[in-house]
Amino acid sequence: TVQSVNAIVLSGGSAFGLDAAGGVMAALREKGIGYRAGASIVPIVPAAILFDLNNGGDKDWGTASPYPALGRKAFETASDDFTLGNAGAGFGANAGGYKGGLGSVSMQLADGGPTVGALVAVNAVGALTHPVSGAFFAWDSEIDEEFGGVLPVAEDRGSAVRMPKLSGPGENTTIAIVATDAVLTKSQCKQFAIMAHQGL
């Protein structure tokens, strides 16, 4: 049975974006990477997609979806240093009336202990800022004034939050990969996944 994966794909493009995994699978297969099933090589590539089709831009690509080529390009240019923000799965993302995008963080839990990392494509529904001051709800997690250094004011408390207009149900998605180098049992992996989901 399959015990591991060869790559994980996050993509925009709604269901069309699942084709990106095909591009990654083809590139892996050419390199002989994948699950061995007799004489066949089957790359194991789970994928998740977000809905960003109503963000403007040209979606009339004709009979050939661009996503397999985008997946292959992502595979070929993959490195430890990668672009955040308007890149990859986060390219067409929006969040609460602002530009969404791709974010990442990792940390070692203790000296010499395991590392936990997260890669998130944010295309979320809802409001991101306090209604009066415009301070981000996450202001207390700000590092080096990355959100502009705006602090909430007393008038924010109890004020109605302005929700951006939604064009329809199911048109916002946030997807993530949460990973660790800790050695986990199957039941520990399940608990890790539950905690990651709750954090999302």
Model segments located where?
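A structural signal for small-residue-enriched, beta-sheet-centric alpha/beta enzyme cores
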Residues: T1-A15, D19-G22, A26, E30-L200
